[in-house]
UniProtKB/Swiss-Prot annotation:
Gene: rbcL
Residues given in the record as Mg(2+) binding sites: K191, D193, E194, K699, D701, E702, K1207, D1209, E1210
CDD domains for the chain: RuBisCO_large_II (cd08211)
Keywords, sorted A to Z: Calvin cycle, Carbon dioxide fixation, Chloroplast, Lyase, Magnesium, Metal-binding, Monooxygenase, Oxidoreductase, Photorespiration, Photosynthesis, Plastid, Repeat
Name by which UniProt lists this protein: Ribulose bisphosphate carboxylase
Length: 1501
């Protein structure tokens, strides 16, 4: 069909789309195949990428159309096409609602990469709107953290000089450690190369300890920090986590110095997310090896390198390799600096879109590939800065004087550029400036002597200018392992045999003498079983010798470097990859990879497919001398194949469930529910019910999962109901494939467990679908290992980016599917071998043979599977009953799984009949094959069968174009004389009400109208009712009321915008949808008051709207915030909107726990009763960070001599220098001593904040185990703003007897008066009482150093009183315990009296750091002075000083109390400001400033 009327709207304006923020925009270069109209093809492309089908299906409704992807721009002459994807289309996590990059890729470069009418389509840019971008984590750590570790601050820290230990493979543990030691003498950073990890010859548990020893030695010797990037890539997320934990256990206190490298392209985005979420504090080093398979300019499939790196920032890479922008050996161009800008700037222009990152951390560019000191200056000049990470292997290890000097030379390359840039060499060229610098710096001068080809090219005349008259080539320094024996104490080195010779020429070499051996015999290699064999089509660039290029390819794929390096030994050479066959005329090349090269799991020693891909299509995909290189086949020897799991379940298990035995069970008739996106839960269940009346198997399509409009917890129960009903009615088992794909492995596991909990005894009937190409092999392994009994349905959407015959990069579709069997897919989509709509050829049947047979021939190798279970071919893409017979005849059998969407839902008589017709297509072929129709053609045989089978006859009437093509003369033979096209049956949802008992369907009211224009609506008639009375709303108690300051954008009506705001915050959509009924409207949020002049708006939210716990039915603050300041914060028509107050009705308030402990419990412990216990004098141990355990304990001891309460400051917890298991015992000792000495109880607040709730609980339990009988004296501090309300609830529910100390650090990001988004500080603190904080910091109400105002006392009243007025509402707390105000921030004894007077009482907790530790006589006296500040105010309030001012009253008190008098002498600026004339009144004539007492730790012992 020409779908342009539905999937294209060229009137859409890009600026408007961006302003509205509801669409992801994607720019493609797309070319239709010859003879196809551009717009029609573009619309088909958008349809295939969203909700579309090849034929009209009976399940499309208006809501479906509202989430169509739309082509909004085309330029056929330049092959440009832009598509807008509604953000609702994309899948979300069920665990946290976050976004999933695999979902974006599944749609944007999924099935559209294999379309029959598209020559090619490649993403050149994309734009994520702000609200959608916020669903992605972004980086948690980046180069700023590296700079901090290196002691360079956090801005403009410059070049991080790093290396790759060369050779990339081949070193054993001790030589590896020695190489690290040598480089770190001069450099900063070492990375594992992408294939390194846990090879048999260099196991992680032997290698990492050597690295740690080397790091410790170098840190000690050089006085500088060092960094290491350890490769944790694995197929299995559990293996990645195990690797990461092991490495951190070895690095210990140096853990922050260790980055984790992930091969993000070959292992997939799931691996990246696994690393980031499990190790959020480690620098996530994204290695892109293999990306050139897709990104290369040589192909127009997939996406560009720019897009690939932009994606890396979205998904949270700390750093990613970006090539060398033409200044190194890899493909690239100087304009690639735009890639770096997109990674590092907060706003940056791509080729088509400007992306605003809205404060998302930058991703740091990592440069490598032929770089050395001589190439760096021009690179920096092109980029404009040097804030990148360098990993120069040859540039350091290839330097004539060794890696230390090589590293220093690279740093000098940066310095030379900086000095030239600053004009220090005068008005000369950059090349001459570097030469001038080199005259006085031997290290970079040595780089000229080493890398002379580079010098000749970049620095003309350098020999004369540097006075060099020597030979044209200089040898690299011999890295003498024996000489390095002096390092043995540090790196556990062993002395290598003296015979080793590794001093070789230092130019770009023909490496065929080492990496090629054409005498090797393939049969012998296979018999020996020690090598993985890989066959490529490879073409060198013009002017390059074939064998030399092939050898370079093998070197780059294994142990090689561009230059000879000083670390190569005999063992290294034993694991070289070897070219053993070439045929330049046919561009054929074969390489033998020693099996020892490949990485293994540390948990179980099993193989890792990501390691194979990293070597076989890793860096070789971007080589400067290679035009292209693509894998066409590979061979795994038996012993190596056994290291892979293979499938655990396959179609035989399906047949068993379906009652067909376990052999030759034939076609499994399945479908994709169409449209693939757009159906809501009940219609989805109804569609399942309808198909299963005739069919076997339904799959979620690849982008389906947990969309907002079709959430898993609503959809899966409908599917289960439908399955149960159909099993009962038809007497046959049914099968369903549920999509569990996610970026985060934990999310995948959570999805799988939830689905199985719903299917219950039908769990074996449920397969799990994984988008194996876009999410990567790690996701496949995650599924297989966690759910070994489920059919693992591998969807390959997007694979065409690599496998398409249009490109000669990466690997073929044959290789891709062969890999799927190795890694354990139960079934994989294999196309339709030219019999459907997708690209393919009849010879693709060899793919199926390789998947299903125990021995099979590929294009180059025969593979013996040695009993490994088969992987079942899944066919889809335009298939229907008419196309199946010829497909089976070509394949030779029908033991496949069919997922025919249009073939069932497009059938004129509906999906049940469509499914039956497909089964009849198989039966017709079988009968013809058995000769039941005599000696006639297959097409005539199918026609004969159709004469007596109405269902397949109906397929002829439905799919007439196919009938005309495949079955000539069918109309006459079947006696058909009707119209040439028949409409698909209308799938009437109301008629489907007969299924209500099974799928929970309800019949829509007849009056419902849902066919509306696709424009933004004025929703005020539905979402606003200004006649509502606030007092009545409060009396009725059915609504939460929220008062906002809201301003529409220019040109928008206030009421219409307010109604849109309420709609967006509750039940609304941008267009009317067919699922709205009267109940929906009953829970609409309603605008009940507006004052446009003052920008005031009030909304009433029905309490039924809010989410509740499934465990206990209690309320959830996150649900309130999601609605009240959720999506409305990113609306295109709203300038700003901020909550200023809210009201919770009594019955709703009771759903929240409130505080379980508060200051009354503190007073009781302190022996002050439970009412009016007054000020709790506390402090923060200063400095907030930096004290070690014993000094920390001593500081506690000193303060507790006079004070009550000490809190960990918000960043304190378990720093390396002050670990919790060392610090807390010191605190307990100090508390015990002070309780005994002073006779008074003491209190401590320990910070248990952590990202992981399990970590918080572990911290809390440990602390209580240490405090023992003093546990009630210990509060738990939670950084409630930065860690979120979930952390607060975690603490309160797990430790209900502890005082919950809510620290609000960071809240100013939202609450500051400087912004009109989010909510105010008043609202933030009011929320804290609702969710159960015992105490919260409230600022100092203008009396301290923090922002605030005297009127902020209303915050304290709302926290402490049982009824209190906010700016808009009076809240009755109905006996809910109070939350205690905590004051800090510049407070001391002199500031307290006026604070108490403003507040009206002193029932607060003070945490005064400077006010105690800053007192001239030390913290004990400082604490006592604060208590005296309260007492002075009380006495003045009681009139004990007569009718004088408060300031004079405090001075009177001070005359007889030395401690507070000392505060006057210490804090003289405060005294001058608050107490005029204090010096004269106190008789003080001394100096104007007094130093604080020296806190002598030794004296304090």
């Amino acid at each position: 069909l020409d779908q342009s009327s539905r999937y294209a709207d060229l009137s859409l304006d890009e600026d408007t789309l961006i302003r509205n923020g509801k669409h992801v925009l994607v720019a493609y270069i797309m070319k239709p195949k010859a003879g196809y109209d551009y717009l029609a093809t573009a619309a088909h492309f958008a349809a295939e990428s969203s909700t579309g089908t090849n034929v009209n299906v009976c399940t499309t409704d208006d809501f479906t159309k509202s989430v169509d992807a739309l082509v909004y721009y085309i330029d056929p002459d330049n092959e440009e096409m832009k598509i807008a994807y509604p953000t609702l289309l994309f899948d979300r996590n069920i665990t946290d609602g976050r976004g999933m990059m695999c979902s974006f890729l599944t749609l944007a470069i999924g099935n559209n990469q294999g379309m029959g009418d598209v020559e090619y389509g490649k993403i050149y840019d994309f734009y994520l709107p702000p609200a959608f971008l916020r669903l992605y984590d972004g980086p948690s750590v980046n180069v700023e953290d590296m700079w901090r570790i290196l002691g360079r601050g956090t801005t403009n820290g410059g070049l991080v000089v790093g290396t790759i230990i060369k050779p990339k493979l081949g070193l054993q543990p001790k030589p590896f450690g020695e190489a690290c030691y040598s480089f770190w003498q001069g450099g900063d950073f070492i990375k594992n190369d992408e294939p390194q990890g846990n090879q048999v010859f260099c196991q992680m548990n032997e290698c990492i300890p050597e690295v740690v020893k080397a790091m410790r030695a170098c840190v000690k010797e050089t006085g500088s920090s060092k960094l290491f990037s350890a490769n944790i890539t694995a197929d299995d997320p559990e293996e990645m986590i195990a690797r990461g934990k092991y490495i951190m256990s070895q690095f210990g206190p140096l853990s922050e110095n260790c980055a984790f490298l992930v091969d993000g392209y070959v292992a997939g985005g799931t691996a990246v997310t696994c690393c980031r979420r499990n190790f959020p504090k480690q620098f996530l080093h994204y290695h892109r090896a293999g990306h050139g398979s897709v990104t290369s300019p040589q192909t127009q499939r997939g996406y560009t390198a720019f897009v690939h790196t932009k994606i890396s920032r979205v998904i949270g890479a700390s750093g990613i390799h970006v090539g060398t922008m033409s200044f190194g050996k890899m493909e690239g161009d100087a304009s690639d600096k735009n890639i770096a800008y997109m990674l590092q700037d907060d706003e940056a222009d791509g080729p088509y879109y400007r992306q605003e990152w809205q404060g998302m951390k930058e991703t740091t560019p990592i440069i490598s590939g032929g770089m050395n000191a001589l190439r760096l200056p021009a690179f920096f000049e092109n980029l404009g800065h040097s804030n990148v990470i360098l990993t120069a292997g040859g540039g350091s290890f290839g330097h004539k004087d060794g890696p230390k000097i090589g590293a220093i030379s690279c740093r000098q390359g940066e310095e030379a550029w900086k000095q030239w840039k600053a004009g220090q060499f005068g008005n000369i060229s950059l090349s001459d400036g570097v030469i001038e610098y080199a005259k006085t710096h031997e290290e970079i001068k040595g780089a000229f002597l080493t890398f002379q080809k580079d010098a000749d090219q970049i620095y003309p005349g350098w020999k004369e200018k540097l006075g060099y008259t020597g030979e044209s080539s200089v040898q690299a320094a011999s890295f003498d392992w024996a000489k390095r024996a002096s390092a043995a104490a540090f790196v556990g080195a062993s002395v290598a045999p003296a015979k080793k010779e590794n001093v070789v020429a230092r130019q770009a070499l023909d490496q065929s003498s080492r990496y090629a051996d054409l005498s090797l015999d393939e049969d012998t290699l296979i018999r020996n079983g020690k090598h993985v064999l890989v066959a490529y089509i490879m073409k060198p660039k013009a002017g390059y010798d074939y064998l030399a290029t092939a050898a370079h390819f093998a070197a780059e794929s294994s142990t090689g470097t561009n230059v000879n390096v000083c670390t190569t030994d005999d063992f290294t050479k034993s694991v070289d990859a070897l070219v053993y066959y070439i045929d330049p005329d046919n561009e054929e090349m074969k390489i033998a990879y020693p099996t020892l090269l490949f990485d293994r799991n540390i948990t179980d020693g099993r193989g890792m497919m990501c390691s194979f891909l990293t070597l076989a299509i890793g860096n070789n995909q971007g080589m400067g001398d290679v035009e292209y290189g693509k894998i066409y086949d590979f061979y795994l020897p038996p012993a190596f194949l056994r290291l892979y799991d293979g499938p655990s379940v396959n179609v035989e298990d399906m047949w068993r469930i379906l009652g067909r035995g376990t052999t030759n069970g034939g076609l499994v008739v399945g479908t994709i529910i169409k449209p693939k996106l757009g159906l809501q839960p009940k219609p989805f269940g109804e569609a399942c019910y309808s198909f299963w009346q005739g069919g076997d198997f339904i799959k979620n399509d690849e982008p389906q999962g947990n969309q907002v409009f079709c959430q898993m917890n609503e959809c899966i129960p409908e599917v289960v109901k439908a399955m149960r009903a159909c099993v009962k009615e038809t007497g046959s088992s049914k099968l369903f494939s549920a999509n569990i794909t996610a970026d985060d492995p934990e999310e995948m596991i959570a999805r799988g467990k939830y689905i199985m909990s719903q299917f219950g005894p039908l769990s074996e009937n449920c397969a799990f679908l994984v988008d194996g190409y876009v999410a990567g092999g790690t996701a496949v392994t995650c599924c297989r290992r966690n759910f070994p009994k489920q059919f693992l349905h591998y969807h390959r959407a997007g694979h065409g980016s690599v496998t398409s015959p249009q490109t000669q990069r990466g690997y073929t579709a044959f290789v891709h599917t062969k890999i799927s069997r190795v890694i354990g897919a139960s079934g994989i989509h294999v196309g339709t071998m030219s019999f459907g709509k997708m690209e393919g050829d009849a010879s693709d049947k060899n793919i199926a043979y390789m998947l299903q047979d125990d021995e099979a021939d590929g294009p180059y190798y025969r593979q013996e599977w040695q009993g490994m279970k088969e992987t079942t071919p899944i066919i889809s893409g335009g298939m229907n009953a008419l196309r199946l017979p010829a497909f089976f005849e070509n394949l030779g059998h029908s033991n496949v799984i069919l997922t025919a969407g249009g073939g069932s839902f497009g059938h004129k008589d509906g999906p049940k009949i469509g499914a039956i017709s497909c089964r009849q297509g198989e039966e017709a072929w079988k009968q013809w094959k058995a000769g039941q129709f005599g000696n006639i053609s297959l097409s005539d045989g199918v026609i004969e069968y159709a004469k007596t089978h109405e269902e397949i006859k109906g397929a002829f009437l439905t799919f007439q174009k196919d009938a005309d093509q495949i079955y000539p003369g069918w109309k006459e033979k079947l006696g058909y004389t009707g119209e040439s096209s028949v409409q698909a049956a209308s799938f009437d949802w109301a008629k489907r009400a007969s299924a209500a008992a099974f799928v929970g369907a309800s019949v829509a009211p007849a009056k419902k109208e849902n066919v509306v224009a696709r424009q933004a609506l004025d929703q005020s008639s539905r979402y606003a009712d200004l006649s509502l009375d606030e007092d009545t709303l409060i009396r009725n108690g059915k609504h939460v009321l929220v008062a906002y300051i809201m301003k529409p954008k220019a040109g928008y009506d206030y009421l219409a915008t307010a109604a849109h705001f309420a709609a967006e915050s509750s039940t609304g959509t941008n267009v009317n949808v067919c699922t709205t009924d009267d109940f929906t409207k009953s829970v609409d949020a309603l605008v009940y008051y507006i004052d446009p002049d003052n920008e005031e708006m009030k909304i009433a939210y029905p309490t039924l709207l809010f989410d509740r716990n499934i465990t206990d039915g209690r309320g959830m603050m996150c649900s309130f915030l999601t609605l009240a300041i959720g999506n409305n914060q990113g609306m295109g028509d709203v300038e700003y909107g901020k909550i200023y107050d809210f009201y919770l009705p009594p019955a709703f308030l009771r759903l929240y726990d409130g505080p379980s402990v508060n200051v009354e419990d503190m007073w009781r412990i302190l022996g002050r009763g439970t009412t009016n216990g007054g000020l709790v004098v506390g402090t923060i141990i200063k400095p907030k960070l930096g004290l070690q355990p014993k000094p920390f304990g001593e500081a506690c001891y000193s303060f507790w001599q006079g004070g009550d309460f000490i809190k960990n400051d918000e960043p304190q917890g378990n720093q390396v220098f002050c670990q919790m298991n060392e610090c807390i015992p010191e605190v307990v000792k100090a508390m015990r001593a002070c309780v005994k000495e002073t006779g008074s109880s003491k209190l401590f607040s320990a910070n248990i904040t952590a990202d992981d709730p399990e970590e918080m609980i572990a911290r809390g339990k440990y602390i209580m185990s240490q405090f023992g009988p003093l546990s009630e004296n210990c509060a738990f501090l939670v950084d409630g703003y930065v860690a979120g309300g979930t952390a607060v609830t975690c603490c309160r529910r797990n430790f209900p007897k502890q005082f919950l100390h809510y620290h609000r650090a960071g809240h100013g990001s939202v609450t500051s008066p400087q912004t009109q988004r989010g909510y105010t500080a008043f609202v933030h603190t009011k929320i804290s009482r609702v969710i159960g904080a015992s105490g919260i910091h409230v600022g100092t109400m203008s009396f301290g150093k923090m922002e605030g105002d005297a009127s902020d006392k209303n915050i304290a009243y709302m926290l402490q009183d049982d009824e209190a007025d906010g700016p808009y509402y009076r809240q009755e707390w109905q006996g809910m315990k109070e939350t205690t105000p905590i004051i800090s921030g510049g407070m001391n004894a002199l500031r307290l009296p006026a604070f108490f007077e403003n507040l009206g009482h002193s029932k607060v907790i003070l945490t005064a750091g400077g006010g105690s530790f800053g007192h001239k006589d030390g913290p004990k006296i400082g604490a006592i002075s604060c208590r005296q500040g309260e007492e002075a105010w009380k006495q003045w309030k009681a009139g004990q000083f007569g009718n004088i001012s408060l300031s004079d009253g405090v001075i009177e008190y001070a005359k007889t109390h030395e401690e507070i008098k000392g505060a006057f002498l210490t804090f003289q600026k405060d005294a001058d400001q608050i107490y005029p004339g204090w010096k004269e009144k106190l008789g003080y004539t001394g100096e104007s400033s007094v130093q604080a007492a020296s806190f002598d730790w030794a004296k304090r012992a």
